Structures are given as C-alpha cells and as structure tokens.
C-alpha cells in the first residue's frame, strides 16, 4: 500500500481516483476500481432520473463497501440537485466532488455524515473561499 492522504482516508491500496466522466463512468467501472485497490467517482447526472440514481447508489454502497464518490453539479443547471442531496443523505458515499457552483449546501448537508466533500476550483482565491466553508 502506498501511504498518502488519499490511501489513508479511503483505505485503498493506490492513490488513484477513477475520474467522473459524464455519460461514460458507470457502476461496473467503479466496482472494478474498488476490486483493484483504488476508488472511483461517477457523475450523479449519469443516472437519468433520481430513482435510477438511488438504485445505482444502493448498488455501489453494497458492492464497494461505501468506497466510491459522486460528482455533483451544484449550480441551477442540475434540476435534480435537491433530490440528489436527499438521496446522498440516505445513502452516503465516501466522498463527493462538487463542480460548477458553490459547494456550501453540499458541505452543510453531507460533511456531518462523514462524507468528504472535495471541490473543483478554478483559482487560489476560489480555493480559499471554499476552504472557509469547511
């Protein structure tokens, strides 16, 4: 096992995150990542409905022992964001990567459940702002 923040935090063998790829990543890929010592992430919007999302999350929690991540678009273009957050509160993943907006609501709702909230940032100023959110 390579010892890094990533391997220690998620108890994985290799410090690798299978990137969330819109309409490419799928549960099978994340399950194989888990079986091979690293961790995968899938965009919530790869599941076309909130019902499919909840079913997919349930499968991943079972097959990956909860060791997977979800990429959430957190701006108004994600019409399912509230439902996705509700589902993630019921079935928490190991981590969430927020993109394209403020992660504040995601942090408030998921961090208390032990979910690591990672945030896409575009510059140091935004990184500091996100860091101040917790």
Predicted regions and their residues:
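Active-site entrance/lid segments in N-terminal catalytic domains of soluble metabolic enzymes
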Residues: 1-134
């Amino acid at each position: 096992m390579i010892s890094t923040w990533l391997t220690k935090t998620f108890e994985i063998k290799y410090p690798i995150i299978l990137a969330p790829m819109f309409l490419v990543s799928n549960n099978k890929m994340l399950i194989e990542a888990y079986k091979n010592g690293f961790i995968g992430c899938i965009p919530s919007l790869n599941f076309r409905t909130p019902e499919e999302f909840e079913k997919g999350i349930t499968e991943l929690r079972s097959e990956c022992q909860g060791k997977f991540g979800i990429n959430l678009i957190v701006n108004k273009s994600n019409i399912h964001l509230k439902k996705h957050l509700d589902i993630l509160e019921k079935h928490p993943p190991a981590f969430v990567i927020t993109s394209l907006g403020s992660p504040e609501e995601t942090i408030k709702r998921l961090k208390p459940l032990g979910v690591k909230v990672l945030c896409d940032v575009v510059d140091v100023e935004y990184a500091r702002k996100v860091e101040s959110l917790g």
